[in-house]
């Protein structure tokens, strides 16, 4: 029964393909069961889905072939076996057609995807070319110009600060010198006050001495007046006595002459009194002259001390005013320096923020450029993979078309033999293509691009 089924299948397939008539086989063989044909179909489909090389169609292989029962008798073929083969062939063709439609649909989807990716690739290539052809960005120039301006301002601020510090040091030195002069003037003032106090003691002593001398002069004058009074009383007494004696002389001529004695005594007393008065006046005049000279000297010293003290006071006042002015100038300069430091620190902070923002923008641009390059590289890899898949499908389709358009006359030359899985695997060739693409970039710009392709047949 199996022999009749195989014979009818082959005859039906032959008649369906070439019309009536019986084919002539150089070798008559029959298939044992339907399982052999189905196994051959599944094996062929496996080869189409796995291999990139076209399967050999010169022989019709089966993994399992039943024992061939040959009937050699007057070139007679069992048409029932041909009908069974025809049905199997139709089923196989239907399955292959469905698979081809599925492959065509997948191939069409891949083609659409490839077109879309090629369009995206062209867009990215145009974008990259536009970015490459565009004038170099001025961000770096603006950044350098801004940095130069900031450095110039920092140098200017540094110079101003150094100048202000030099002026401050000079003012501090002047202030120290003025303080030293003030200390010296204060010391001179204290010395003058000490001298003035000493002179005041001398003046007080001189005043006391003058008062004492005045008192002594008064006492001497009183004594002189008292002596004059006593002398006058004595003179009056002597005159009275002289008159009485003169009367007695007139009365008594024999008595000695007392007039000459009285004159001598009067002359002596007058000489003594005149001498005492002259000596007292001379002593008084000398003392008064000495006291006047001492008082004059003391007055001159006091007047000179007062004048020097007034000069020192004026100098102290002028120095105090100058110190106050210098303190005000120093305070204003310190305030200006603090204001300048705060201003320049704020400006420096703003410039640092601007620099950080520009650096962040540059990093973002570099990251974006690197991301575009990675996307471009990924798209290139996808495109190469799709190109390889398209080439594989193209080869599969070409192999399938060559298998379909094979002349049916070779069907008579088919030799049905058992093929082991090891032999089938040896006829399946897989081609592996490895492409290594090297892109060198620097700061987001493509410097060089190189690609290497290696093919290996597995």
From Swiss-Prot:
Segments for region (Head): 2-96
Database matches in SUPFAM superfamilies: Intermediate filament protein, coiled coil region
Main location: cytoplasm
UniProt KW keywords: Cell membrane, Coiled coil, Cytoplasm, Intermediate filament, Membrane, Muscle protein
UniProt region (Coil 2B), positions on chain: 284-400
Compartmental location: Cytoplasm, Myofibril, Sarcomere, Z line; Cytoplasm; Cell membrane, Sarcolemma
Site (Stutter): 342
GO biological process, one term: skeletal muscle organ development
Region (Linker 1): 130-139
Spans annotated as Tail: 401-458
Region (Coil 2A), start-end ranges: 257-275
One GO MF term: structural constituent of cytoskeleton
Sequence segments annotated as region (Coil 1B): 140-240
Keyword Membrane carried by entry: yes
UniProt region (Linker 2), positions on chain: 276-283
Family to which this protein belongs: Belongs to the intermediate filament family.
Main function: Muscle-specific type III intermediate filament essential for proper muscular structure and function. Plays a crucial role in maintaining the structure of sarcomeres, inter-connecting the Z-disks and forming the myofibrils, linking them not only to the sarcolemmal cytoskeleton, but also to the nucleus and mitochondria, thus providing strength for the muscle fiber during activity. In adult striated muscle they form a fibrous network connecting myofibrils to each other and to the plasma membrane from the periphery of the Z-line structures.
Subunit structure: Homomer.
Name recorded for this polypeptide: Desmin
Upper classification of the organism: Eukaryota, Metazoa, Chordata, Craniata, Vertebrata
């Amino acid at each position: 029964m199996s022999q009749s089924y195989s014979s009818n299948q082959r005859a039906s397939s032959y008649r369906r393909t070439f019309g009536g008539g019986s084919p002539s086989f150089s070798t008559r063989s029959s298939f044992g069961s339907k399982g052999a044909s189905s196994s051959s179909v599944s094996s062929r489909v496996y080869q189409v889905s796995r291999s990139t090389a076209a399967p050999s169609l010169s022989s019709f292989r089966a993994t399992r072939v039943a024992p061939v029962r040959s009937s050699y008798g007057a070139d007679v073929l069992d048409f029932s076996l041909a009908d069974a083969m025809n049905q199997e062939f139709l089923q196989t063709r239907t399955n292959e057609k469905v698979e081809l439609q599925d492959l065509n649909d997948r191939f069409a989807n891949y083609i659409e995807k490839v077109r879309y990716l090629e369009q995206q690739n062209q867009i990215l290539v145009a974008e990259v070319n536009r970015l490459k052809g565009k004038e170099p960005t001025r961000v770096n120039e603006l950044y350098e110009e801004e940095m130069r301006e900031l450095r110039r301002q920092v140098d200017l601020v540094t110079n101003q600060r150094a100048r202000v510090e030099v002026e401050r040091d000079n003012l501090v030195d002047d202030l120290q010198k003025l303080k030293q002069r003030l200390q010296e003037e204060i010391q001179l003032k204290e010395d003058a006050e000490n001298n003035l106090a000493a002179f005041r003691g001398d003046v007080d002593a001189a005043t006391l001495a003058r008062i004492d001398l005045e008192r002594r002069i008064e006492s001497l004058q009183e004594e002189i007046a008292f002596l004059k009074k006593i002398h006058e009383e004595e003179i009056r007494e002597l005159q009275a006595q002289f008159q009485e004696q003169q009367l007695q002389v007139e009365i008594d001529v024999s008595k000695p002459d007392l007039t000459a004695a009285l004159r001598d005594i009067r002359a002596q007393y007058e000489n003594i009194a005149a001498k005492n008065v002259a000596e007292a006046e001379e002593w008084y005049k000398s003392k008064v002259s000495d006291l006047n000279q001492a008082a004059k000297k003391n007055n001159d010293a006091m007047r000179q001390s007062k004048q020097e003290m007034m000069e020192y006071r004026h100098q102290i006042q002028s120095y105090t005013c100058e110190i106050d002015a210098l303190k005000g100038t120093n305070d204003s300069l310190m305030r200006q320096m603090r204001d300048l430091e705060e201003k320049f620190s704020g400006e420096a902070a703003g410039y640092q923020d601007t620099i950080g923002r520009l650096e962040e923008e540059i990093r973002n641009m570099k990251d974006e450029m690197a991301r575009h390059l990675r996307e471009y590289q990924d798209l290139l890899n996808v495109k190469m993979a799709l190109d390889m898949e398209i080439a594989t499908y193209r080869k599969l389709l070409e192999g399938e078309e060559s298998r379909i358009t094979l002349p049916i006359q070779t069907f008579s030359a088919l030799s049905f033999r058992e093929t082991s899985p090891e032999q089938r695997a040896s006829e399946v060739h897989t081609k592996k293509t490895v492409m290594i693409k090297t892109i060198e970039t620097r700061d987001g710009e493509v410097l060089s691009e190189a690609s290497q392709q290696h093919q290996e047949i597995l």
